[in-house]
Amino acid sequence: KNMITGAAQMDGAILVVSGADGPMPQTKEHILLAKQVGVPSIVVFLNKADQVDDEELLELVELEVRETLNEYEFPGDDIPITSGSALLALEALTENPDTNRTGDPWVKKIYDLMNEVDNYIPLPTRDTDKPFLMAIENVVSITGRGTVTTGRVERGADQVGDNIEIVGLKETRQATITGLEMFQKTLEKSVAGDNVGVLLRGIQKEEVEPGMVLAKPGSITPHKQFEAQVYILKK
């Protein structure tokens, strides 16, 4: 459930596979889910490379990963694959936070991975000119501040002071945005693609729930019937 919710928002993904063990059953599940929910691009990180003494074994794991990606209709032959050790890179950075790509070979591998992400996964086009819309994924109550809804802005933009509508499941409600936060940073404005927490004035936690949306007033209306294409996943 959490994997599907997260993957549905992704513009790209890093598939982490143990270089010592190769693809596991859950690896295939994650690749299938990524394909079904429309993750457009994947890069691969073969972790635990420090535990593999024979370079040929690592090459066999890479070949197996590419074949698995091809099986689920990703371009496995073209997807960049980087090997390294997240643990050893973390230990090097913990010991010396100023370590850069030239200071430690395992840290360099992480830099190499992120370069592949930058080069292979294209920057997405955002619908910033359309009316604001955000699907609510979670709702929390902060003592002394009010109710915060979290989610990814699907289109448009919003800012502190904007009036919005809460639409779906219950009667449509009006609310005012009194705060925006993203990764523990306070914002004045958020735009399409941002994962944000939206603080709402005068709304109780029990009045909103996941599945509802925040929208520009008058831009959308709720419906009780719809047509859908459903994917049934089985083991």
Swiss-Prot record:
Ranges where the tr-type G domain occurs: 1-125
EC number: 3.6.5.3
Signal peptide: none
Reaction equation(s) it catalyzes: GTP + H2O = GDP + phosphate + H(+)
Listed transmembrane segments: none
Cysteine disulfide links: none
Keywords for this protein: Chloroplast, Elongation factor, GTP-binding, Hydrolase, Nucleotide-binding, Plastid, Protein biosynthesis
Enzyme class label: hydrolase
Function: GTP hydrolase that promotes the GTP-dependent binding of aminoacyl-tRNA to the A-site of ribosomes during protein biosynthesis.
Entry similarity comment: Belongs to the TRAFAC class translation factor GTPase superfamily. Classic translation factor GTPase family. EF-Tu/EF-1A subfamily.
This protein's name: Elongation factor Tu, chloroplastic
Gene: tufA
